């Protein structure tokens, strides 16, 4: 870490250690919220580069080991954010009068390598096949060899042709040929048992997803030689699995009595991809500086500015969600068990990857996904936000972040971003050194007054 930033990061670590002593992964309550700060001069509400840099450097540091979904490192990030919310005088909206919200997760884990039988041929996970995702088990069906451009009917066992685009959304089991990418991770994936993804416990159980299996080259050739309609069975012995993820949630009550009952949610996901096992000479930590420490810091910066200056007209809930990278579990729980009634939420604004300017747009510009779906983007832009419509609607960014959880429940919900297609995305290269702090600070600052006036 550069020496000039060491002092600020050490100070943040001290703040975290103090908060961690008061808050546990089991959701113990922190102490009482700080008193409401007195109104300050206008310049105290500015978003400073020093603020943005210091918080992002900590959240994306090696000390948090990539903030892996549902890990102790994710909990540390949530606890750290909670300590800041407390300091700024936000109202706690988490468990037991605190700011941290624990979300218990439940799933299933295979206890032995799953097996696939097609006709008289048997294949085993880790040998002739690799089970990538685990759906319903046991499962039975008949082989259907898809042609290029074809689509599998509901419940089908679909064999995907090499290099062809096909529809597999309704298939129960998908059989694909191994790829170079799969071959590179074959040994690592074979060494652990497949699992059904953890999901928030207590919510309506989802329909089991597809089982996706990659067949090694000889096995794929053997299955391809079989006739359509050949009987298929898939077996896996499953045991319950459990885990947890953590949100950090605080509230700032609006200043206008006529509008304070309406709630604006400002959100981001605090988790990332964690770390791979250590390897000599290799960077194995996915720091997630842009994805999504940048969005998390944007929410923190807005919380700080709005809490220290004039209150916003409407009540604002600041929500940092866990396990977005593992399926959006923190947001799913929040929407299912909201801290304020859903029908009082006028909009959710998710912040995702604000750390680099978009080469297609002017500097310091942000864009809003699904711009045409509501008047929110136009309203914010008219009030001074550096905000335009998503220039790449073909990428379907509207459905690719936690805002979609709100949208599916009828809440106006969008994501604000600045660029998400850079080469460091979801790699260990997503480091603080690549963040454009001047761009990020100016872009966030342009949102303070528009949000305050909403």
What is the predicted function of each stretch?
Residues 121-124, 212, 220, 311, ...:
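Metal-dependent peptidase/peptidase-like ectodomains
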Residues 36-41, 46-72, 88, 92-97, ...:
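N-terminal capping segment at the start of a domain
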Residues 65-163:
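Noncatalytic luminal/extracellular "stalk/propeptide" segments of secretory-pathway proteins
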Residues 20-22:
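Bacterial signal peptide processing site
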Residues 121-149, 192-288, 301-304, 308, ...:
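Soluble metallo-hydrolase cores and metallopeptidase-like ectodomains found primarily
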Residues 44-93, 109, 115-117, 246-319, ...:
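Catalytic-core environment of secreted peptidases
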Residues 304, 423-454:
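His/Asp/Glu-rich mid-to-C-terminal helical/loop segments that flank catalytic regions of hydrolases
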Residues 16-18:
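C-terminal motif of bacterial Sec signal peptides marking the signal peptidase cleavage site
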């Amino acid at each position: 870490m550069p020496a000039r930033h060491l002092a600020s990061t050490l100070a943040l670590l001290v703040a975290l250690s103090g908060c961690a002593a008061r808050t546990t992964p089991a959701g113990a309550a922190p102490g009482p919220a700080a008193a409401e700060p007195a109104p300050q001069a206008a310049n105290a509400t500015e978003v400073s580069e020093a603020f943005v840099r210091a918080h992002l450097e900590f959240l994306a540091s090696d000390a948090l080991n990539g903030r892996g979904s549902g890990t102790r490192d994710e909990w540390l990030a949530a606890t750290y954010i909670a300590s800041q919310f407390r300091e700024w005088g936000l109202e706690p909206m988490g468990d037991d009068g605190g700011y941290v919200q624990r979300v218990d997760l439940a799933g299933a884990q295979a206890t032995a390598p799953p097996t696939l039988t097609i006709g008289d041929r048997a294949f085993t996970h880790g040998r002739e096949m690799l089970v990538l995702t685990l759906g319903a088990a046991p499962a039975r069906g008949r082989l259907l060899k898809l042609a290029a451009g074809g689509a599998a009917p509901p419940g089908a066992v679909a064999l995907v042709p090499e290099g062809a685009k096909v529809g597999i959304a309704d298939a129960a089991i998908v059989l694909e040929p191994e790829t170079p990418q799969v071959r590179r991770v074959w040994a690592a994936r074979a060494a652990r048992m497949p699992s059904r993804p953890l999901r928030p416990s207590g919510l309506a159980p989802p329909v089991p997803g597809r089982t996706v299996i990659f067949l090694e080259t000889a096995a794929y050739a053997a299955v391809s030689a079989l006739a359509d309609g050949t009987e298929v069975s898939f077996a896996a012995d499953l045991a319950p699995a459990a885990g947890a993820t953590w949100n950090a949630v605080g509230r700032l009550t609006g200043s206008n009595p006529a509008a304070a009952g309406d709630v604006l949610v400002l959100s981001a996901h605090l988790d990332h991809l964690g770390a791979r096992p250590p390897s000599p000479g290799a960077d194995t930590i996915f720091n997630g500086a842009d994805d999504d420490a940048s969005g998390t810091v944007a929410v923190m910066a807005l919380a700080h500015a709005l809490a220290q200056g004039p209150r916003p007209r409407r009540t604002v809930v600041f929500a940092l969600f866990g396990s977005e990278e593992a399926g959006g579990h923190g947001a799913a729980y929040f929407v299912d068990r909201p801290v304020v009634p859903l029908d009082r939420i006028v909009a959710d604004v998710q912040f995702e990857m604000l750390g680099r300017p978009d080469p297609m747009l002017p500097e310091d510009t942000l864009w809003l996904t699904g711009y045409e779906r509501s008047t929110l983007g136009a309203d914010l832009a008219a009030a001074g936000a550096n905000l335009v419509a998503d220039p790449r609607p073909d990428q379907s960014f509207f459905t690719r972040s936690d805002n979609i959880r709100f949208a599916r429940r009828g809440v106006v919900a969008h994501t604000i971003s600045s660029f998400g297609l850079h080469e460091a995305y979801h790699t260990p290269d997503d480091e603080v050194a690549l963040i454009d702090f001047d761009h990020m600070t100016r872009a966030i600052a342009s949102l303070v007054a528009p949000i305050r006036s909403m």
